A protein has these predicted regions:
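Glyoxalase I/VOC metalloenzyme domain signal
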Residues: 3-67, 75-131, 147-199
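Short acidic/glycine-enriched loop/turn segments that link adjacent beta-strands
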Residues: 69, 138-142
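Conserved S-adenosyl-L-methionine
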Residues: 132-136
Length: 199
């Protein structure tokens, strides 16, 4: 199922057989038809050389496919949800740091704990990647961010023990718009920018 964000960003829902992630249950959609999550992410890059070093040495990825135009890496145990596809586009004009409506700001990767997150931060800095943030408390999780050689921003995040249930009970998740603590002062402004959802 191909569709577009109102701003023109293209998306596709694709059915696959090899996704063994457990779906959400308890909703109106049958579990076997539920979306399991993101299968892969795609990143455009002008030059593969520096990104290859970052992915393999810095981010711990494994290159599993390369046809010269598209390079696929897997992180962690690989498989659905752990795939990153890089499209090599040497003639593409460099991007801008201005993020427009509908654009993806960064890609998040879960790490197991704060120790692992700190090790990754110090490892990246030791390799010379200086654009690594300090830990940011996002209310539901703690994050660090790094600007990769491709220009894409990656996030390494550690979920808080209670995750999204830190500010609402599990049986009420998704019924109200919840705002992370650091953004609550801007809630009215943020809500005004959201489009209206029809039942």
């Amino acid at each position: 199922l191909d569709f577009q964000h109102p701003c023109g960003v293209e998306y596709a829902l694709v059915a696959i057989d090899e996704d063994d992630r457990k779906p959400h249950t308890g909703g109106p959609v049958a579990p076997e038809l539920m979306i399991r999550g993101t299968y892969s992410i795609g990143v455009s890059m002008r030059d593969a050389e520096f990104m290859e070093e970052f992915m393999q040495v810095g981010w711990g990825g494994t290159r599993v496919a390369d046809d010269g135009k598209l390079i696929r890496y897997e992180v962690g145990e690989g498989g659905a949800g752990a795939i990153i596809d890089f499209e090599v586009e040497p003639d593409r004009k460099p991007g801008t740091w201005i993020v427009g409506e509908g654009a993806i700001h960064h890609m998040a990767f879960q790490v197991d704990n704060h120790e692992q997150q700190n090790e990754l931060k110090f490892h990246l800095e030791g390799l010379g990647y200086t654009d690594v943030s300090d830990v940011k408390d996002r209310g539901y999780f703690d994050s660090i961010y790094v600007r990769t050689p491709s220009g894409a921003m990656f996030e390494a995040t550690v979920s808080h023990d209670d995750g999204f249930t830190c500010d609402e009970p599990a049986d009420k998740l998704g019924l109200e718009v919840m705002i992370a603590p650091q953004l609550k002062v801007s809630k009215e402004e943020l809500m005004a920018q959201l489009g209206y959802l029809k039942d």
